[in-house]
Amino acid sequence: MVFDLGGISHFTGQNQYPVTWSVTESALLLNTCYHPTEWDIYWRLEPCDFVMRKLEREERLFSTPAITEAWAHAVMRHPLAYLQHRAAFTWNFLSGNNLTMWVADVERPTETVFSDRPAFVALVSLHDMLKPSPLFRAGTWLVLCIVVCGFAWPRRETTEGAFALGVCGSAAIYVLTFSAVGVASDFRYAYWAVLAGIVGGAVTALGRLKPQLS
């Protein structure tokens, strides 16, 4: 809800949080802070962490009905701004160049973890080479799951068809729920769709080949 309130505030140009901000904070909130990527911007990333600091520590409103009421009020008063925000997030989640592999050293943020291990360094190099490709886009795997469901539907009475429809259907629904409730765009949130698309696609293909092989 904090993320949604930030998005609606940005698209309406009006504060939707149940608190007041300084002139500087308002300018940041409405013009600078919002990115359709993750709610961490308002939680722990400077210079916009003042949002959660005020909601949670100063006003003690986080996880209270005040936030829920402010969210419901904002959505009802500004449905188009809410949809703009959710659409922007969804597009970024499905097609954006999002975080795929954590390589930063928490204790030494400027350094890469396991930099002294050749195998890991090789893995990071492969990751960097493949990251711009569709393989690391959540939308690719969502589309694959939907396509597999389309091929599996006519064979849903068979074991292979039911399996593919079950795993890929659940993965597609899971990914699509992020359009309404997602608050972060990391590629890891699409892992189920990746596994389901690969396994479901393989099972569907084998099921279609079975009559030709028998």
Language-model features: locations:
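Aromatic-anchored segments of alpha-helical transmembrane domains
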Residues: G169-A180
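Membrane-interface anchor segments at the N-terminal boundary of transmembrane helices
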Residues: Y82-V167
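Membrane-interface catalytic loops of GT-C/OST-like multi-pass glycosylation enzymes that act
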Residues: S179-A193
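Membrane-embedded alpha-helical segments of multi-pass membrane proteins
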Residues: G139-L144, A190-G200
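Membrane-embedded glycan transfer/ligation machinery
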Residues: L45, D49, S170, A190
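Membrane-proximal stem/loop segments at transmembrane-domain junctions that anchor or position
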Residues: M1-V113
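Membrane-interface junctions at the ends of membrane-embedded or membrane-associated helices
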Residues: W153-E160, G201-S214
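Catalytic cores of PAPS-dependent sulfotransferases
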Residues: V147-F151, I173, G197
